[in-house]
Amino acid sequence: AFILVSTYASFIQYLKLDYFGYFNMGKSVANMSYLLTEYLNYKNIILIGQDLAYAKDGFSHTKDYKNLDKHEGHFQRDKGKFQCLAYGGNGKVESSEIWTTFRLIFENDINYFQKLFNITTYNCTEGGARIEGTIEKPFLWAC
């Protein structure tokens, strides 16, 4: 058993849960979940919902997203700064600094775990940024 913490913070040691161990990694819930699946010895991992890029219309989330107003101006701020290869390998998409960080962490972890543990990672997001090292498949393929 372990305790999951999103990032190391000194107060965690005061919880006195050393018996269980600590699991500190990743910059996002998705990055942490990816590494957790490796520790649980899964050999096939499927990513869904990891666009990590703005939509063609410049939106960061679906138009009915409750906190969309908190992201106003982000596309204009990031445009041209964090372009990357699109899912499917056709063209480029606009991303952000944090999404680029998440993607690079994924790519590093995917490469590492594929080489060391023969883990296969599928990206069934069907859009957004290409995550190098994944096998791109349609969402319905994963169902």
Feature annotation, model-predicted:
Residues 1-143:
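Metal-ion/cofactor- or nucleotide/acyl-coenzyme-handling active-site neighborhoods
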